[in-house]
Amino acid sequence: MTTSGLKPKTYSIEGVRPIIHPTAFVHPTAVLIGDAVVGPNCYVGPGASMRGDFGRVIMEEGSNLQDNCIMHAFPGMDCVIEVDGHIGHGAILHGCRVKRNALVGMNSVVMDGAVVGDSAMVAAMAFVKAGFEVPDRILAAGTPAKILRALTDQEVAWKEEGTRDYQRLVVRSHASFQECDPLTEEEADRPKLDAGASVPLFVKKKAE
């Protein structure tokens, strides 16, 4: 939901309606159908789709589902993002479980029955096949995805910092997000956004 009066596209099916916690931010172009549950302090980005028309799709507290992501599941199955889960732009989750504090990279696909463990990461563009399990604090990558190595403390901390920025974006969006007309030219004193401190991982590694 938004404080600007703009509402996401929500649809019931067979009398089952989506649930959006009042502290969550769901972009007005996101689509939620049926048995879709968005928990406290979650962020759902532009163009995201949560289709709860077969199985249940669930976002637990503090998780984020970024632009153009898809969540869906077979009948009788759940698709779950646990607490502080982080789903990058364009990823597809189908009947899988992304566990606490885990990250799924941009344009990755995680298939039915797969599990991404606590504080684990799936690299961008990966394909996690059905039933595959990524252990806790492990990096998986490739098509199909394979176990690469254990994550470092620095990498896990980097992920957590990025997730906190999305949790702050929820607050920022509730406070100031609104539809507007664009300017026709740049102002001389155009301000920069106070958007947080996270940086790309390669930048962080170079700096430390």
Protein language model features and the residues they cover:
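Glycine-rich hexapeptide-repeat left-handed beta-helix
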Residues: M1-I19, D53, E61, D67-C69, ...
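A positional/architectural concept
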Residues: I19-A73
